[in-house]
Amino acid sequence: MSESQNNSSDQHMDRYFFRAAAVDFKKIPGSPIGYWVSSRQFDCFEKYPQLSTFAVSSNGVQTGNNAKYVRLWSEVSASKVNIRWYPYNKGGQFRRWYGNFDFLVNWENDGESIKSERNFCARGEEFYFSKGITWSDITSGKLSGRILPEGFLFDASGPSAFFNDSSLTYIGLALLNTKFSDSWSKILNPTLHFQSGDFRKLTLAPSYISESTRLTAKALLKISKEDWDFYETSWDFTSLPLLHPDHRQSALKASYRRLRSHWHEMTEEMLRLEEENNRIFIDAYGLQDELTPEVPLNEITLTCNPHYRYGGDKTDDELEAMLLADTMRELVSYAVGCMFGRYSLDKPGLILANQGETLADYLAQVPQPRFPADDDNVIPLLDGDWFPDDITLRFRQFLRVAFGDAHYEDNLAFIEQALNVKSKRNYGLREYFLGEFYADHVKRYKKRPIYWLFSSPKGSFNALIYMHRYRPDTVSVVLKYLRDYREKLATEKERQAAVSINPASSQGEKTKAMREVDRLAKVLTELEDYERDVLYPLATEQVQIDLDDGVKVNYLKFGAALKKIAGLEAKDED
């Protein structure tokens, strides 16, 4: 082959291969292969000090038995937080700046019990409860750093770092959330993990340590925390955003528009600040020719941003419909919380959130509620207005109190239309409660529901209770509702039977009545079996629960009396 042919072949191959000098790889700690990296980026590792110079990172606590020692914060009594149960950072989904704070760990008496576990392991114990930064170990998407407030423990799923100079904490957080760090995380560890050792190998340019960087990070953190606390799954949740004075109007549609506008402004501001953070970084590291500051909208990690929350290839109209539907589901969930006394329209934050609390405890905190809590902790979900405290009736009352009477019908229609995502005919609030509501609740609370659904085999009888208000006689109260309901159905069956033989009834009326008689007979048989075989024996047991044991243990004590939750019996990962 001639020299010209060789040159031509080399040029052809250059189209498909990167060329890099082996000596450049040695500039990266651990010498990983990053063949696509430019020489200028290689120089960053040689020129600037590693984060190990400024911070210590650690994998924290390995409990050895998560099923025994770890809970979602909503599972236990609020009064035991920071006494027996302590905030526990376990990584979580792709989210930057603030959030993913869902768990508690049993660290009573300085972890006395947990430390006796054979597989227990403690790393970086001197940093427990200290302020730092954290990230999710598994990075199948993007690297995402978050602040770790004081008062937390953490595990290997949420490795954390603590700076020698606390003023660098926000600098480190800002650095971790740049495009550069995300790119380099894939080089330092090409697996789906970014571990504490990988963090220490990132570099920090002195010129990036500035008040501008710090203020940008704090502004981003503030927006992210506001977004996280919008939702009742945050322990700092106070009230529904729709009910905030800045957004609430008498017309729910107008309230939502105001809130949606606020969410859009938050998203746009975070986008601007994210790009500003990247710009500061690029200038500090001299990478103007290597990187651009732009951030795609689906990486603005706010739950109120539908492009992030839902992702995929959906149109803007589809995303908006999904966000509206979820916002209405959150309104319904908050209303149910007010029905049980977990929340109140008259006082922010949690009201009843400790085991065994009663209506008297509620009235001690909210003496004159505009919308009172249910008196017996049992709310029926049925196919009609059979009881005055039926969940559909109670929600309608809530809607009138929260938004007034002036636009009540329009407000109700707005909710029902938003919830009817499958465009079903004759779909209303009752259909939502009987259909999707409980599945939504179970999903919201990560298969550890705080409201439990007593449900007959075919769902003809349903009653909801709040586990924090559960008492050993609660099942007996549910049983009384069931028996009252059976009596009402039996009376209705007799009435329909009378219609079917009444000479004054038309043939169509008689046929319809006979069908209803047959249907009610089947329902009554179902309810008789449910009472005899399931509910009555359970009521006589006077079952005791302990919230410290968690939903998984307590829910399963009630067997077939409660709605089955798929996967609840699965083994927890340690």
For each feature predicted by the language model, list its residue ranges.
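Polynucleotide-recognition surfaces of large bacterial nucleic-acid defense/processing enzymes
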Residues: 1-116, 121-132, 140, 214-341, ...
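Extended interaction regions within the primary functional domain
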Residues: 57, 63, 67-68, 73-74, ...
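Basic, amphipathic alpha-helical recognition segments used for DNA target recognition
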Residues: 136-201, 208, 216-223
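Catalytic palm subdomain of template-directed nucleic-acid polymerases
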Residues: 211
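Terminal accessory regions of large proteins
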Residues: 268-272, 278-282, 286, 290-574
